[in-house]
């Protein structure tokens, strides 16, 4: 059985090598996504913790970014084609919530927002059928810097006050379990060809960020997340 699997894997590698050695051309895409993030959460309180304090409910927020997709393209201007490219870029990720906080003897629902400057590194294979360009991929986002906006309770004044904390990379590593998050995404573009090497794409994207886990002694699990959806404009240059 192991021999069969080894031979099958070897045949797959040879076939893949032959595929990329024939009719594939280098190319690059420049993509500008604009959209919304719909925040998610996964929380489990510790046994002795107050089950109401710190509970999150998701809100939506605006997000944006910029990415480049250098890769290899086959049949870019044909009726059917395929490409495999890196997904490299910058993204402003926002996780926005309503948070239940204890102030004195009462709870108050406050707005809490985590914003991050991220560098994404991933892989984005795409199929083109006629003028439609469809991609499914994923990778990781490195949290370079960020901030937290919320309201905290002042015991002396017996009231909540606005609070904003900035995070550099070291502070992110202290606040969260990992400074990177996995992501998956799908893209759908309609291409307008200027010639057989250059095209403008207008389309949609959707994805999910498996957000960072907050270090908090009240929780055994306190994970952020977001469903992302929006529109994008792209330019593709392929050496056909």
State what each model feature region is:
Residues 1-4:
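Positively charged n-region of N-terminal signal peptides that target proteins for export
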Residues 6-8, 28:
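Short helix-onset patch at the extreme N-terminus, typifying the N->h transition
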Residues 8-16:
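Bacterial N-terminal signal peptides
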Residues 20-81, 234-240:
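Short glycine/proline- and aromatic-enriched beta-strand/turn motifs that initiate or cap beta-hairpins
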Residues 22-30, 78-84, 119, 130-134, ...:
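Outer-envelope beta-barrel architecture signal
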Residues 30-36, 64-74, 88-90, 121-129, ...:
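Residues on the lipid-exposed face of transmembrane beta-strands in outer-membrane beta-barrel proteins
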Residues 36-63, 89-120, 142-181, 185, ...:
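Extracellular/periplasm-exposed beta-strand and loop segments of Gram-negative cell-envelope proteins
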Residues 194-201, 211-215:
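Substrate-binding/catalytic groove segments of enzymes
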């Amino acid at each position: 059985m192991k021999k069969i699997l080894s031979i099958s894997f070897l045949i797959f590698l040879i076939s893949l090598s032959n595929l990329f050695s024939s009719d594939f051309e280098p190319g690059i895409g420049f993509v500008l996504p604009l959209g919304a993030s719909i925040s998610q959460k996964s929380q489990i309180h510790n046994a002795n913790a107050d089950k109401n304090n710190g509970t999150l409910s998701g809100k939506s927020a605006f997000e944006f970014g910029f990415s480049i997709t250098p890769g290899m393209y086959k049949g870019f201007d044909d009726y059917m084609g395929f490409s495999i490219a890196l997904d490299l870029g910058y993204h402003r990720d926002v996780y926005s919530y309503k948070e239940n906080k204890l102030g004195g003897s009462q709870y108050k629902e406050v707005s809490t927002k985590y914003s991050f400057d991220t560098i994404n590194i991933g892989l984005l294979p795409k199929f083109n059928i006629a003028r439609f360009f469809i991609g499914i991929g994923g990778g990781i986002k490195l949290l370079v810097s960020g901030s937290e906006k919320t309201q905290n309770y002042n015991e002396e004044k017996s009231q909540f006050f606005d609070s904003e904390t900035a995070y550099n990379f070291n502070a992110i590593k202290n606040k969260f379990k990992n400074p990177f998050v996995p992501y998956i995404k799908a893209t759908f573009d309609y291409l307008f060809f200027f010639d057989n090497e250059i095209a403008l794409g207008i389309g949609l994207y959707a994805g999910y960020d498996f957000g960072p886990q907050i270090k908090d002694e009240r929780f055994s699990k306190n994970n952020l997340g977001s469903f992302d959806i929006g529109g994008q404009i792209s330019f593709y240059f392929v050496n056909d």
